[in-house]
Regions:
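Thiol/disulfide oxidoreductase modules built on the thioredoxin-like
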Residues: 148-154, 162-205
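N-proximal helix/coil linker or "cap" segments that precede and/or mark the start of modular domains
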Residues: 46-78
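Bacterial N-terminal signal peptides
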Residues: 32-47
Length: 210
């Protein structure tokens, strides 16, 4: 009886792959069930990730959020913020340039020297009090952020978004993603990807900071 029961569990599905009334490549029910489970898992795993929000657009209002204050006192003074945390509206100046970046993002490293040049130009053109620059490193730890600053890769302050909270609020943009914000959190300009022409970008910042 046990043998007959075992044979019953492995009934051959003869309606699949028939040729001339004879079975071709017989498939057992347990195998079909397994294939069904695998297909279901694949449909879930391969589905595109859902974004929590849309990317910020020009003239939209940025959702409220806080960031950990930079550990270096010189960066705190530059931004005009104090530990433990601050909101974008707390930053000194009229215009805040926010760069969403990744610690291991190749395009971010491509943009870094361009933005360092932009940072220097802002200081030289006496815009330093009106325009501030801030990098937000998504998924980064304190150690990784401190390494970025100490290595000289970034001359402006970088803070971490270790748990991706801000990244999700902003619609999970690819990196780098740049925003120009007003004091009250209004989005003045956005750019997804590397800003290669700093000479063309700088006049826009000047105009917004008047």
């Amino acid at each position: 009886m046990a043998k007959r029961g075992h044979e019953h569990e492995n009934i051959i599905v003869s309606s699949i792959f028939r040729e001339g009334g004879k079975m071709k490549n017989p498939v057992s029910l347990p195998l079909l069930a397994l294939l069904g489970v695998l297909c279901s898992l694949a449909s879930v795993l391969l589905a595109p990730p859902a974004q929590c929000a849309e990317l910020p657009q020009k003239d939209s209002q940025l959702p409220p959020f806080e960031l950990p204050a930079p550990s270096a006192e010189i960066d705190q003074q530059y931004l005009g913020v104090k530990p433990p945390a601050f909101a974008p509206k707390d930053v000194a100046g009229q215009v805040l340039l926010v760069e969403i970046l990744g610690v291991y993002c190749p395009l971010c490293y491509q943009q870094a020297p361009l933005f360092n040049k932009l940072y220097g130009r802002i200081q030289k053109k006496s815009l330093g009090d009106r325009v501030k620059m801030l990098g937000i490193a998504i998924g980064a730890t304190t150690v990784e952020v401190e390494h970025l600053r100490k290595s000289g890769s970034y001359e402006y302050p970088i803070v971490r978004d270790e748990s991706f909270v801000v990244h999700k609020l902003l619609g999970e943009p690819r990196t780098p993603f740049t925003m120009l914000l007003s004091k009250d959190g209004k989005v003045l300009h956005t750019h997804l990807g590397v800003i290669e022409d700093i000479d063309a970008f700088f006049p826009l910042i000047q105009a917004l900071a008047k």
